[in-house]
């Protein structure tokens, strides 16, 4: 079961929490949900080069608070805050609520699964050898304290006639252990031969207490640390 489902969804309410944090009545729920989807689409399109890890949306009374987790906060903010004001106006066109933007720096992008997946996808688009891109990402993650990492690349890798899946793993990635802090990210590389999918799982240790905010708090404090013995599985 743990190998089939999204590891973040499996741990919601245990050591992970939702990226949209608000409550609404049945008449408003659909409208606010569509607003969230549009806000995420606009931000991901405008900030494609900013290394966006995730976007958290909270809705206090008549307000819309958006936290953008990024590896390059300077790109998001812009010169003298010009870009962030532009983003605030764009979001203001989507929602009637008062918009507040908060930029959160990702201190260790090498152990953020979404950023690692996007980085590998960009390398595949630049025709970097997929094995080299995967191994480089694995080595960087393990060097910065990850307990384990697994990377899957699927598609016409290297321009092959037949699509296949290649994977590389180092350390422990206990997907069945609910107390394990597993980060998961996906990205799509649009190559000349077609699309290639990239999936990344990163194990950052165990969270023993029942705390849905524990994983996010650990990331904000920069205290990501792996646990357990390391095992290497080198395919190619």
Curated annotation (Swiss-Prot):
Keywords: Ribonucleoprotein, Ribosomal protein, RNA-binding, rRNA-binding. Residues 39-107 form the KH type-2 domain. CDD domains: KH-II_30S_S3. PROSITE patterns: KH_TYPE_2, RIBOSOMAL_S3. HAMAP family: Ribosomal_uS3_B. Belongs to the universal ribosomal protein uS3 family. This is Small ribosomal subunit protein uS3. The lineage of its organism: Bacteria, Pseudomonadati, Pseudomonadota, Alphaproteobacteria, Hyphomicrobiales.
